[in-house]
Amino acid sequence: VKGQQTLKAAEVLVYDRLGSEELLSLVPEDCERIYVGKEAGHHIKKQSEINRILVEKALEGKRVVRLKGGDPFVFGRGGEEIQALTEAGIPYEVIPGVTSAIGALEAAGIPVTHRNIARDFHVFTGHISHEGGEGLSGDYSLYAKLPGTLIFLMGLSNLEEIVKRLIDGGKDGETPAAVVTDGTPVSYTHLTLPTT
């Protein structure tokens, strides 16, 4: 409800590719909409430019809403955005949604944990390493030995390599697995600023 009210009061909306038409329809007609959509290998705006837009629009005294798909604080660069706001002295409020790491599985009817089967869960990026520029990051021989549910976000394009590395690391090839894409297209987190 709070997220809905926030969208209805927006003067500037900065939103991603994963924004749903249902949510976008809540924004007032006269709201300035700034599309900053990102997808693998193609960024409309660089992260530094998104940060600059958020700061500039807030400093203009406008009620800015940042609509992000999934969980902005789990591989979503939301931390970088609030860091830019904090450094600029701009107050903000985070209105959390359901993290896609859990919500997508729930929407598919897959328990993240289940008594006597999976008492733990672990979340990893399935994306290419930004540090090295190529290849997956992380110690897959370690991941393969972890108990419980292993969740890889943004890993569809690297699925074959993820599976190979887990099996090479010792994971049983018969381990049950599921692939969920676009599992919760309306699970969003909103950053709202300023909060004066």
For each feature predicted by the language model, list its residue ranges.
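Short, solvent-exposed amphipathic alpha-helical segments in soluble enzyme
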Residues: 2-6, 28-31, 80-84, 110, ...
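Class I S-adenosyl-L-methionine
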Residues: 3-98
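Short, charged/polar "capping" segments at the starts of alpha-helices
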Residues: 20-24, 131, 161, 186-188
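Short hydrophobic/aromatic-enriched beta-strand-loop microsegments
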Residues: 31-38, 91-93, 112-122, 170-179
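Class I SAM-dependent methyltransferase SAM-binding "motif I" and its flanking Rossmann-like core
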Residues: 69-146, 186
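Conserved anion/nucleotide-ligand pocket segment
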Residues: 137-176
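Short, flexible loop segments at boundaries between secondary-structure elements
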Residues: 178-188
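Conserved small/polar residues in nucleotide/adenosyl-binding loops
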Residues: 189-195
